[in-house]
Amino acid sequence: DQDEGVSTEPTQVGPAELHNDETCVGPLVYRN
């Protein structure tokens, strides 16, 4: 949510989705 540098990596879904979806393989992996 606060990491803009990480949310700028749209892998499968949009940045907004990645913040809420933990199943997505992308920025979420970095934060969790």
UniProtKB/Swiss-Prot annotation:
Keywords: Disulfide bond, Fertilization, Glycoprotein, Secreted. The keyword Secreted applies. GO terms for biological process: single fertilization. The keyword Secreted applies. Residues 1-32 are annotated as: Disordered. Residues 19-32 form the Fibronectin type-II domain. Glycans are attached at T11. It is found in: Secreted. GO terms for cellular component: extracellular region. It comes from the Eukaryota. Could enhance the fertilizing capacity of bull spermatozoa upon interaction with heparin-like glycosaminoglycans present in the female genital tract. Exhibits both simulatory and inhibitory actions on the release of pituitary gonadotropins. Binds to heparin and gelatin. Belongs to the seminal plasma protein family. Homodimer. This is Seminal plasma protein PDC-109. It comes from Bos indicus (Zebu).
